[in-house]
């Protein structure tokens, strides 16, 4: 029997995932106590119904879940069942907004605020997150994308949405991009701003790019940073992340960060990475 465990944070999209699996013919059950899981699986096995695919929503609402899930999962695997654990996640900001929109209280901690409930739930589920088959970050997903991703995962990877990388340059003077997953500070690189003939131009112009790339420290840095991203991107994909925001910052967001972002964009685009580029602050400070 194929068993999919749907778990993770409250408000992260588990109900949507269950509906997607129901549409694929899975027998779905929500909030089954851990103590009854083994009995339930045995009943399904001996049922007259031809049930081959089961999805169980198991999370912190069942108070014995945290202490008992490991033993139950091992028992299912030992019985010869194919067990996959899909852990659904989202950023605190997104979860807080979703709870605010639905006017729901957080179910994990009675009497606590939503942020307190989220922190408590993250802490309680940390061990489960580490053993998950896939970690699905729904922060940037709509319902359609989430359903498509879940269906792709149960089909062994077919149809899984390709992760989109959003590369952007910015100026620290104007604040960090709040949506950033990764931030790289390139203010240590030689600054074209202090070259009078280059100051009016941007990192999109050849002269500025040649100046930035013409220094050994830039070449060495770029090689190491590219290698790091090439290591990280597959790991983020395996976690089920559909969107990765990489921000490159310099002082004003016009010269160094733009030049470096363009170099990275061209490099990864040639390697068929689904990547987009924006320059948030390139036109600021001109007047």
From Swiss-Prot:
It comes from Geobacter sp. (strain M21). The keyword ATP-binding applies. It comes from the Bacteria. Belongs to the RapZ-like family. GO terms for molecular function: ATP binding; GTP binding. The lineage of its organism: Bacteria, Pseudomonadati, Thermodesulfobacteriota, Desulfuromonadia, Geobacterales. ATP binds at residues 8-15. HAMAP family: RapZ_like. GTP binds at residues 59-62. InterPro entries: P-loop_NTPase, RapZ-like, RapZ-like_N, RapZ_C. This is Nucleotide-binding protein GM21_3387. Disulfide bonds: none annotated. PANTHER family: RNASE ADAPTER PROTEIN RAPZ (PTHR30448:SF0). Displays ATPase and GTPase activities.
């Amino acid at each position: 029997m194929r068993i999919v465990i749907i778990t993770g944070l409250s408000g992260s999209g588990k109900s949507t995932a269950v509906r997607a699996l129901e549409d694929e013919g899975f027998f779905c059950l929500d909030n089954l106590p851990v103590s009854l899981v083994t009995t339930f699986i045995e009943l399904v096995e001996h049922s007259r119904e031809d049930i081959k695919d089961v999805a169980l929503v198991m999370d912190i609402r069942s108070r014995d879940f945290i202490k008992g899930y490991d033993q139950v999962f091992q028992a299912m695997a030992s019985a010869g069942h194919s067990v996959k654990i899909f852990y659904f996640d989202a950023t605190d900001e997104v979860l807080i907004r979703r709870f605010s929109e639905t006017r729901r209280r957080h179910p994990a901690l009675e009497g606590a605020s939503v942020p307190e409930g989220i922190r408590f739930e993250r802490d309680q589920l940390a061990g489960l997150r580490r053993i998950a088959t896939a970690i699905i970050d729904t922060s940037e997903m709509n319902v359609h994308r989430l359903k498509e991703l879940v269906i792709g995962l149960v089909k062994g990877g077919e149809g899984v949405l390709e992760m989109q990388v959003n590369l952007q340059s910015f100026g620290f003077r104007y604040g960090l991009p709040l949506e950033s997953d990764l931030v790289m500070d390139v203010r240590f690189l030689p600054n074209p701003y202090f070259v009078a003939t280059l100051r009016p131009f941007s990192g999109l112009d050849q002269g500025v790019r040649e100046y930035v790339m013409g220094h050994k420290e830039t070449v060495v840095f770029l090689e190491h940073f590219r290698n790091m991203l090439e290591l990280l991107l597959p790991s983020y994909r395996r976690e089920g992340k559909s969107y990765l925001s990489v921000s490159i910052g310099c002082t004003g967001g016009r010269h160094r960060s733009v030049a470096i972002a363009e170099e990275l964009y061209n490099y990864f685009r040639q390697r068929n990475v689904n990547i987009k580029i924006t320059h948030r602050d390139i036109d600021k400070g001109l007047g």
